[in-house]
């Protein structure tokens, strides 16, 4: 997989989960290794040493001198921003010396290409987006399993792609389908990755400190597509639809869209409402032959006007995951699985089966007809907007934390529409208050999450939801978003005990 290089020397930058996976993979293939981390003793250093991986470790600031001594490839961990001055200087020096810079995804793509020479040709599905990646990735994996395929789910969702590939090789159990959750960080260094089908779920402001601008962030998301990849795009998101080919382009037939409205193009997906019931539907051409959508589109001449009908797939209420945003995620997962020609029937059964992921618009209790919803994973504005619009009921919102420099303005309309009140916590509560001041919704500041939950419970009325969807990172008050969720759940348990209810 390293071309003509014999025992290439690889510099791995950053010893997080992906960096450790790159180091393991390179050691497995006989590479000489130098590993650098800005920390003198990163947590995974002990694991590296315990596994007996022969590598030179260098702790401290990154400098171009790390490239000396015959480095052939730089393996870049996804958590490291290429805009950070010291790293930017090192990467510029690598470019001047024509040293390749690969992330874990590029190592994975090269590995699959090498395995392909021995006849291994799996299907690869990939998912990215600001929000909904983990839910859609897990759901897509389940759909493929229920269709009878051996499936590996990896990437940003964990485990690392290279670790999962290594274990599959060792167990002689290479999967039929890879389903990969990919972050913008992972996609930034993608060069030859070309999945069979890939979805962009949405693009809203996030990680701008890492990428430098929204346009750069969106461009990284777009690297998920190869030249022949079927594109699964959210037509309700203008930033996503910039990746749609022009109508007459050669690859337009390989583009499928999904959204919350009725689809109007053959093979697209959406929602249709009839007699008060919302359905997941597929648009079909009544006059089309019994062929795949892509084949029909390729054969169609300009004179044919499709006679579009909506084929009902299942009622939205049959999904166990709450919210219209999750209906969109379900459509994306279904579209990905259909893009590799998996049969519809087992996919629809799997959609009904899926229960969702922890801390993602998860109803954890209903007390006195008030739902308590854990969306602690909602660490950016787009996630909270999706949660508010998706639940579509009166809500007492708990929000705040480390805003990461985001613009909170997109929260104004959904807060004004859905919120009975907003409880503000964390470092950037003042910025949130300033943004939401003109919504007409009562705002209250709280020093602790526990206090915010108690106050929210007092304000909520039967039929409401108390929603923890912070729109912010958690590290100003908590170890991580899971710790924040644990504190929320404990506070809800206390309310249940006080009211004599079972959470």
Curated annotation (Swiss-Prot):
Catalytic activity line of the entry: UDP-N-acetyl-alpha-D-muramoyl-L-alanine + D-glutamate + ATP = UDP-N-acetyl-alpha-D-muramoyl-L-alanyl-D-glutamate + ADP + phosphate + H(+)
UniProt xrefs under Pfam families: Mur_ligase_C (PF02875), Mur_ligase_M (PF08245), MurD-like_N (PF21799)
Keywords noted in UniProt: ATP-binding, Cell cycle, Cell division, Cell shape, Cell wall biogenesis/degradation, Cytoplasm, Ligase, Nucleotide-binding, Peptidoglycan synthesis
Gene Ontology terms: cellular component: cytoplasm
Residues the record lists as binding ATP: 129-135
Enzyme class: ligase
EC number: 6.3.2.9
BP-aspect Gene Ontology terms: cell division; cell wall organization; peptidoglycan biosynthetic process; regulation of cell shape
NCBIfam families according to UniProt: murD
Protein name: UDP-N-acetylmuramoylalanine--D-glutamate ligase
Protein encoded by which gene: murD
């Amino acid at each position: 997989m390293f071309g003509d290089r014999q025992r290439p020397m690889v510099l791995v930058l950053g010893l997080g989960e992906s960096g450790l996976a790159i180091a393991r993979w390179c050691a497995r293939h006989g590479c000489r290794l130098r590993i650098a981390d800005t920390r003198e003793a990163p947590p995974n250093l002990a694991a590296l040493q315990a596994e007996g991986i022969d590598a030179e470790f260098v702790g401290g600031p990154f400098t171009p001198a790390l490239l000396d001594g015959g480095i052939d490839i730089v393996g870049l961990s996804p958590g490291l921003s290429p805009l950070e001055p010291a790293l930017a200087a090192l990467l510029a020096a690598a470019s001047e010396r024509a040293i390749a810079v690969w992330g874990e995804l590029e190592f994975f793509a090269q590995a699959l290409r090498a395995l392909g020479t021995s006849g291994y040709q799996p299907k690869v599905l990939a998912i990215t987006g600001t929000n909904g990646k983990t839910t859609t990735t897990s759901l897509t994996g389940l759909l493929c399993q229920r269709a009878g395929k051996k499936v590996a789910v990896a990437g940003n969702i964990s485990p690392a792609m290279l670790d999962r590939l290594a274990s599959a090789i060792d167990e002689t159990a290479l999967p039929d389908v890879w389903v990969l959750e990919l972050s913008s960080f992972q996609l930034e260094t993608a060069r030859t990755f070309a999945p069979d089908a890939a979805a962009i779920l949405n693009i809203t402001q996030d990680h701008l400190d890492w990428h430098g601008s929204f346009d750069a962030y969106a461009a990284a998301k777009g690297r998920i597509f190869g030249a022949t990849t079927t594109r699964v795009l959210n037509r309700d998101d203008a930033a996503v639809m910039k990746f749609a080919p022009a109508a007459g382009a050669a690859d337009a037939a390989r583009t499928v869209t999904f959204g919350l409205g009725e689809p109007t193009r053959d093979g697209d997906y959406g929602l249709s409402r009839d007699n008060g019931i919302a359905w997941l539907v597929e648009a079909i051409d009544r006059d089309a032959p019994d062929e795949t959508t892509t084949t029909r589109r390729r054969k169609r001449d300009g004179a044919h006007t499709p006679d579009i009908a909506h084929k009902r797939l299942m009622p939205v209420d049959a999904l166990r995951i709450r919210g219209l945003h999750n209906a969109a995620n379900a459509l994306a997962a279904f579209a990905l699985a259909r893009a590799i020609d998996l049969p519809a029937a087992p996919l629809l059964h799997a959609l009904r089966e899926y229960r969702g992921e922890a801390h993602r618009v998860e109803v954890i209790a209903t007390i006195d007809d008030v739902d308590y919803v854990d969306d602690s994973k909602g660490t950016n504005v787009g996630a909270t907007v999706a949660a508010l619009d998706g639940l579509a009921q009166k809500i007492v919102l708990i929000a705040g934390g480390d805003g990461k420099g985001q613009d909170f303005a997109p929260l104004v309309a959904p807060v004004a529409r859905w919120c009975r009140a907003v409880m503000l916590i964390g470092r950037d509560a003042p910025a949130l208050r300033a943004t939401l001041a003109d919504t007409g919704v009562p705002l209250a500041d709280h020093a602790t999450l526990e206090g915010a939950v108690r106050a929210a419970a007092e304000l909520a009325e039967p039929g409401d939801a108390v929603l923890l969807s912070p729109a912010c990172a958690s590290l100003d008050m908590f170890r991580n978003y899971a710790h924040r969720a644990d504190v929320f759940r404990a506070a809800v348990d206390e309310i249940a005990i006080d009211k004599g209810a079972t959470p």
